[in-house]
Design a protein with these regions (language model features):
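Bacterial N-terminal signal peptides that target proteins for export
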Residues: 2-12
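Lipid interaction determinants
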Residues: 21-79, 83-148
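Bacterial N-terminal signal peptides
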Residues: 10-20
Length: 148
């Protein structure tokens, strides 16, 4: 039972972390994928504030994060990468008081008219990651490591 619960929690922490208050939308018909450089510019050296945690995307592909579900806190130290097909992936061993699990999570990014769309792969819903111009409710990426 604990194993099933911990796997479900990892899925929530590693994958369901991004949506927050974002509105689910369909991807635009004439979008293009973000390039590796655009993804690096978007994430590298920044902390991403999730609904229940924070992740930091360091230079040279290092990744660390924490998340809290109920009264249980989990942490991860691992790797992240930007790919030319618009994907950003992070992976590592999530650890909490009662469990440890490896997870790899990927998001794909598209852009149209400066507006960035994102979805978790392979089956997530598209949502607006960042409006053009920025709006309240856009995903929060802040310079520096805010996980400490």
């Amino acid at each position: 039972m604990r194993s099933i619960k911990s796997r479900a929690l990892v899925a929530v922490l590693a994958g369901g972390c991004a949506l927050g208050l974002a509105q689910v939308v369909g991807a635009p018909a004439t979008e293009r994928s973000l390039t590796k450089k655009e993804i690096l510019d978007l994430y590298e050296g920044k902390s991403w504030f999730w609904e229940k945690g924070i992740a930091f995307f360091a230079a040279k592909g290092q990744f660390n994060a924490f998340s809290e579900e109920g009264n249980e806190r989990s942490t991860v130290a691992g790797d992240w990468e930007a790919l030319d097909d618009g994907r950003m992936c992070f992976s590592g061993v999530w650890t909490a008081k009662s469990w440890r699990r490896f997870a790899r999570t990927c998001f794909v990014h598209k852009i149209k008219d400066g507006q960035i769309y994102q979805r978790r792969t392979p089956k997530g819903d598209w949502y607006i990651f960042r409006h053009e111009p920025s709006q309240e409710g856009d995903q929060k990426l802040v310079p520096g490591d805010q996980t400490k």
